[in-house]
From Swiss-Prot:
Domain of life (superkingdom): Eukaryota
Protein name according to UniProt: Putative uncharacterized protein YAR060C
Length: 111
């Protein structure tokens, strides 16, 4: 990752719209709390029949949850500079169970 990419990544912000299978909600929350980044996340809307309780989704294995989050990357550590690709690419590759169209939409909206 070049110094230019790091600078752009520090300033990145955008709206993430993710389809999160509730079976994977723990992985989703772990990613959002990843030590590599400081996040400012505002859950602006949760669509569908699932709902938000505190920071965790209700336990239901039959529904998919659509989450809109306002993402601002506030800082990066030295360790994170070694990550390949841009921050949105890294995010997209780490999220489990989302389609490639969602990953590309995340990448475009955050650059």
């Amino acid at each position: 990752m070049s110094k230019t990419d790091v600078k752009k990544s520090r300033e990145a912000s955008g709206i993430l719209t993710l389809q999160v299978n509730l079976r994977e909600r723990r992985n989703f929350l772990n990613l959002m709390q990843n030590k590599l980044f400081s996040w400012k996340i505002r859950f602006s809307a949760i669509k569908g029949k699932c709902s938000q309780k505190s920071k965790y989704f209700r336990r239901s294995r039959s529904e998919d949850c659509y989450v809109e989050a306002d993402l601002k990357i506030l800082s990066r550590t030295r360790r994170s500079r070694k990550l390949p690709g841009t921050v949105p690419d890294f995010l997209g590759k780490q999220l489990i169970g989302i389609s490639s169209s969602v990953v590309s939409r995340v990448s475009r909206s955050c650059r």
